[in-house]
């Protein structure tokens, strides 16, 4: 059995936590995040910590408590430090540019691809072949990065496409005659 739920989440200075039944909202310098806690989990706030325990009669109580603890810890980190995700464009003529809240991609199609960013997410391009996504919500950052990657996934022969900065693309050997 995992013991993730037994560790409390420490609330740093400058972070405000509001518990309203099963709805919890965490506010910090990077914004405010809200989440509904699973009904099998009981969250208690004591001074500067959040503790988790399963409710009576919940079959999957400890599992849900561990998941809730991990999600709320990510929310606390998000509103204090924020999350970043880096993408690289590999290929001849593959370029990215940011105009406001729209990422403009040239990925070898006959048309440019415009991807609108959701609220709370910012993007910047240090170079034409790099995209850096920043925001407070870890799940939304990952989803936007996955959406951008889905436009042109790295292909296995030359490795061309949109990839995560830390991704290792396994390449195949070309067919031999």
Swiss-Prot record:
Could you give a single Gene Ontology term from the biological process aspect? cytoplasmic translation
Q: Which GO terms describe its molecular function?
A: rRNA binding; structural constituent of ribosome
Q: Does the keyword Manganese apply?
A: no
Alphabetized Pfam families for the sequence: Ribosomal_L6
Q: Which domain of life does this protein belong to?
A: Bacteria
GO CC annotations on file = cytosolic large ribosomal subunit
Disulfide pairs here are none
What keywords are annotated for this sequence in UniProt?
Ribonucleoprotein, Ribosomal protein, RNA-binding, rRNA-binding
**PROSITE patterns reported in the protein's UniProt record:** RIBOSOMAL_L6_1
Q: What does it do?
A: This protein binds to the 23S rRNA, and is important in its secondary structure. It is located near the subunit interface in the base of the L7/L12 stalk, and near the tRNA binding site of the peptidyltransferase center.
Family, according to the entry, reads as follows: Belongs to the universal ribosomal protein uL6 family.
The subunit structure is: Part of the 50S ribosomal subunit.
What name does UniProt use for this protein? Large ribosomal subunit protein uL6
- Which species is the source of this protein? Yersinia pestis
Which gene produces this protein? Answer: rplF
């Amino acid at each position: 059995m995992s013991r993730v739920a037994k560790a409390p989440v420490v609330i740093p200075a400058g972070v405000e936590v509001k518990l309203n039944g099963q709805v919890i909202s965490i506010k910090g310098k990077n914004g405010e995040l809200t989440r509904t806690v699973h009904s099998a989990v009981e969250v208690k706030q004591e001074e500067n910590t959040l503790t988790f325990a399963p409710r009576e009669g919940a079959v999957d109580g400890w599992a849900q408590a561990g998941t809730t603890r991990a999600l709320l810890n990510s929310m606390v980190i998000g509103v204090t430090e924020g999350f970043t995700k880096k993408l690289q464009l590999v290929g001849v003529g593959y370029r990215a540019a940011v105009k406001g809240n729209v990422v403009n991609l040239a990925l070898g199609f006959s048309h440019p691809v415009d991807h609108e960013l959701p609220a709370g997410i910012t993007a910047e391009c240090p170079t034409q072949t790099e995209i850096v996504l920043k925001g407070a919500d870890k799940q939304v950052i990952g989803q936007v990065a996955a959406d951008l990657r889905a436009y042109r996934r790295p292909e296995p022969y030359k490795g061309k496409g949109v990839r995560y900065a830390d991704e290792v693309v396994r390449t195949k050997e070309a067919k031999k005659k």
